[in-house]
Amino acid sequence: EKHDLILDLGCAEGRIPRLEAAEGIADGRTREIAILRCVGRPVCACVTEITPEGEILLSRRKAQQLAMDHLLQEAAPGDILPAVVTGCTAFGAFCDVGCGAAALLGTQELCISRLRHAGELLTPGQRIYAAIRTLDRVQRRVFLTQRELLGTWAENAARFCAGQTVIGVVRSLTDYGAFIELTPNLSGLAEDDGTLRVGDHVAVYIRAIVPETLKIKLSVLHRVEPQPREPLHYFQTGGHITQWRYGNEHFAKCYTIF
């Protein structure tokens, strides 16, 4: 049947019927593209039947349900887990948190930088770490956050020093200057001469780092060609986090309680 999945099980061949290929296919909540994305990739599935003819039938939907059941029963907000990005949108990234179970990582929870689209930071297929933000056991939904794992202002600022020249990305323009991202969780302010555009990659000179007010003063030197993304630098990749403060006791900026 159209969109059945044929699996190489090593010692045999198995088949996942279309309606068992993903949770939500039967009632229309999940689009057919979710099945097509499985082609050529490893998938988790449960054996549901071996027919008298020897055909092995499997269900990816059942594996997804079991994984989500386990997550909703055993996990808690603040738990850190690995995930794989499956799709990027303007409102966030969809992630596989195990056996195809889906969770949403909202754009505002990706990092401190102001992003217009999750694709500005993540790519489908990318392996990441995230913390559980909330669990909706009634609607069976999981929401993630990543910014708390990418370091505080002080942790990120410690990677730079005044007098250094680095590459940054223009993330926003205001009446008083341009905010330029040095890392996903760290930005500095530079004067805007009117030629900068959001998304520009620029070479900047770090004039000063001011921990007391969480400010980094920059000077734009020149535009550069778009740079390949550096791997995300995580300061925590496991265990549990109960609370997180981005700034200091005087300038919290962002504060999370799980």
What are these regions (language model features)?
Residues 1-6, 30-32, 37-56, 82, ...:
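OB-fold/S1-family RNA-binding modules
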Residues 6-10, 15-19, 57-61, 94-98, ...:
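Short, acidic/hydrophobic/Gly-rich beta-strand patch recurrent on exposed beta strands
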Residues 13-37, 65-77, 102-124, 151-154, ...:
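A cross-kingdom feature marking solvent-exposed beta-strand/loop segments within repeated
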Residues 15-16, 44, 49-76, 80-111:
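Intrinsically disordered, low-complexity linker/loop segments enriched in Gly/Pro
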Residues 23, 65, 92, 112, ...:
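A broad, structure-centric signal for solvent-exposed, well-ordered loop/edge residues
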Residues 70-71, 155-157, 218, 229-231:
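Short, charged, solvent-exposed linker or helix-capping segments at domain edges/interfaces
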Residues 77-105, 113-114, 129, 134-136, ...:
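Surface-exposed interaction/gating patches
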